[in-house]
Protein backbone atom coordinates (compact mmCIF):
# COMPACT_ATOMS: atom_id res chain seq x y z
CA UNK A 1 0.00 0.00 0.00
CA UNK A 2 1.12 3.52 -0.78
CA UNK A 3 0.26 6.70 1.05
CA UNK A 4 -2.22 8.79 -0.89
CA UNK A 5 -0.62 11.97 -2.21
CA UNK A 6 -3.20 14.63 -3.14
CA UNK A 7 -0.62 16.41 -5.29
CA UNK A 8 -0.10 13.46 -7.63
CA UNK A 9 -3.20 11.29 -7.28
CA UNK A 10 -6.83 12.08 -7.94
CA UNK A 11 -10.07 10.77 -6.49
CA UNK A 12 -13.32 10.95 -8.44
CA UNK A 13 -16.01 13.35 -7.27
CA UNK A 14 -18.32 10.64 -5.94
CA UNK A 15 -15.72 8.93 -3.76
CA UNK A 16 -14.38 12.29 -2.57
CA UNK A 17 -17.91 13.39 -1.66
CA UNK A 18 -18.63 10.12 0.13
CA UNK A 19 -15.43 10.42 2.13
CA UNK A 20 -16.03 14.07 3.04
CA UNK A 21 -19.62 13.27 4.05
CA UNK A 22 -18.51 10.32 6.21
CA UNK A 23 -15.77 12.32 7.92
CA UNK A 24 -18.15 15.22 8.58
CA UNK A 25 -20.73 12.76 9.90
CA UNK A 26 -18.35 11.09 12.34
CA UNK A 27 -16.51 14.37 13.04
CA UNK A 28 -13.15 13.01 11.92
CA UNK A 29 -10.62 15.82 12.28
CA UNK A 30 -7.71 13.81 10.92
CA UNK A 31 -7.87 13.59 7.12
CA UNK A 32 -5.97 16.69 6.08
CA UNK A 33 -3.31 17.55 3.51
CA UNK A 34 -0.67 17.11 6.21
CA UNK A 35 -1.97 13.71 7.28
CA UNK A 36 -4.34 12.18 4.76
CA UNK A 37 -4.88 8.83 6.48
CA UNK A 38 -5.58 7.45 3.03
CA UNK A 39 -3.81 4.57 1.34
CA UNK A 40 -3.82 3.29 -2.22
CA UNK A 41 -3.91 -0.48 -2.44
CA UNK A 42 -4.40 -2.19 -5.81
CA UNK A 43 -5.63 1.12 -7.25
CA UNK A 44 -8.32 1.42 -4.56
CA UNK A 45 -8.52 4.14 -1.94
CA UNK A 46 -8.54 2.90 1.65
CA UNK A 47 -9.58 5.10 4.57
CA UNK A 48 -7.46 4.32 7.63
CA UNK A 49 -7.00 5.53 11.21
CA UNK A 50 -10.33 6.79 12.47
CA UNK A 51 -8.91 7.36 15.95
CA UNK A 52 -9.65 11.09 15.79
CA UNK A 53 -13.31 10.58 14.87
CA UNK A 54 -16.20 11.05 17.31
CA UNK A 55 -14.17 13.59 19.21
CA UNK A 56 -17.17 14.23 21.49
CA UNK A 57 -16.12 11.09 23.36
CA UNK A 58 -13.49 13.19 25.10
CA UNK A 59 -16.36 15.06 26.77
CA UNK A 60 -19.41 12.84 27.06
CA UNK A 61 -21.53 15.63 28.54
CA UNK A 62 -21.60 17.52 25.23
CA UNK A 63 -22.36 14.73 22.76
CA UNK A 64 -25.72 16.27 21.77
CA UNK A 65 -24.10 19.63 20.99
CA UNK A 66 -21.50 17.88 18.83
CA UNK A 67 -24.19 15.87 17.04
CA UNK A 68 -25.82 19.08 15.85
CA UNK A 69 -22.62 20.98 15.06
CA UNK A 70 -21.67 22.12 11.55
CA UNK A 71 -18.16 20.66 11.96
CA UNK A 72 -16.13 23.66 10.82
CA UNK A 73 -12.92 21.60 10.62
CA UNK A 74 -14.20 20.01 7.41
CA UNK A 75 -12.54 23.02 5.71
CA UNK A 76 -9.20 21.22 6.12
CA UNK A 77 -10.30 17.94 4.53
CA UNK A 78 -7.87 16.72 1.88
CA UNK A 79 -10.64 15.63 -0.52
CA UNK A 80 -12.88 18.67 -0.13
CA UNK A 81 -11.75 20.26 -3.44
CA UNK A 82 -13.00 17.20 -5.38
CA UNK A 83 -16.19 16.73 -3.33
CA UNK A 84 -18.69 18.21 -5.79
CA UNK A 85 -21.49 15.72 -5.10
CA UNK A 86 -22.01 16.13 -1.36
CA UNK A 87 -25.75 16.81 -1.64
CA UNK A 88 -26.28 13.71 -3.79
CA UNK A 89 -24.24 11.62 -1.38
CA UNK A 90 -26.22 13.01 1.54
CA UNK A 91 -29.48 11.86 -0.05
CA UNK A 92 -27.98 8.44 -0.78
CA UNK A 93 -26.54 7.98 2.71
CA UNK A 94 -29.74 9.19 4.41
CA UNK A 95 -31.51 6.26 2.75
CA UNK A 96 -28.68 3.78 3.23
CA UNK A 97 -27.98 4.50 6.91
CA UNK A 98 -31.29 3.55 8.47
CA UNK A 99 -31.63 3.73 12.23
CA UNK A 100 -31.80 -0.07 12.29
CA UNK A 101 -28.53 -0.33 10.36
CA UNK A 102 -26.87 2.18 12.70
CA UNK A 103 -28.07 0.15 15.70
CA UNK A 104 -26.63 -3.02 14.18
CA UNK A 105 -23.29 -1.30 13.61
CA UNK A 106 -23.11 0.16 17.12
CA UNK A 107 -24.08 -3.18 18.67
CA UNK A 108 -20.95 -4.68 17.07
CA UNK A 109 -18.66 -2.56 19.26
CA UNK A 110 -16.83 -4.97 21.59
CA UNK A 111 -17.17 -4.41 25.33
CA UNK A 112 -13.37 -4.22 25.59
CA UNK A 113 -13.38 -1.08 23.46
CA UNK A 114 -15.92 0.54 25.76
CA UNK A 115 -14.19 -0.12 29.09
CA UNK A 116 -11.45 2.24 30.18
CA UNK A 117 -10.04 3.50 33.42
CA UNK A 118 -12.25 6.04 35.14
CA UNK A 119 -15.29 5.16 33.06
CA UNK A 120 -18.48 4.97 35.10
CA UNK A 121 -20.77 3.92 32.25
CA UNK A 122 -21.48 0.39 31.11
CA UNK A 123 -20.67 -0.67 27.56
CA UNK A 124 -24.40 -0.73 26.79
CA UNK A 125 -24.79 2.85 28.05
CA UNK A 126 -21.89 3.97 25.88
CA UNK A 127 -23.29 2.13 22.86
CA UNK A 128 -26.60 3.92 23.46
CA UNK A 129 -24.84 7.30 23.38
CA UNK A 130 -23.01 6.45 20.14
CA UNK A 131 -26.27 5.29 18.59
CA UNK A 132 -28.13 8.43 19.70
CA UNK A 133 -25.26 10.56 18.41
CA UNK A 134 -25.37 8.91 14.98
CA UNK A 135 -29.15 9.17 14.68
CA UNK A 136 -29.20 12.82 15.81
CA UNK A 137 -26.22 13.69 13.60
CA UNK A 138 -27.91 12.10 10.59
CA UNK A 139 -31.10 14.07 11.24
CA UNK A 140 -29.00 17.27 11.28
CA UNK A 141 -26.89 16.33 8.25
CA UNK A 142 -27.98 19.46 6.40
CA UNK A 143 -25.93 21.43 8.92
CA UNK A 144 -22.64 19.69 8.15
CA UNK A 145 -23.43 19.34 4.44
CA UNK A 146 -23.97 23.11 4.21
CA UNK A 147 -20.75 23.69 6.15
CA UNK A 148 -18.81 21.45 3.76
CA UNK A 149 -20.30 23.16 0.71
CA UNK A 150 -19.52 26.59 2.13
CA UNK A 151 -15.95 25.53 2.94
CA UNK A 152 -15.56 24.10 -0.56
CA UNK A 153 -16.86 27.32 -2.14
CA UNK A 154 -14.19 29.32 -0.33
CA UNK A 155 -11.50 27.08 -1.87
CA UNK A 156 -12.57 27.77 -5.44
Predicted regions, residues:
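Phosphate/dinucleotide-binding and metal-coordinating scaffold of catalytic cores
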Residues: 1-156
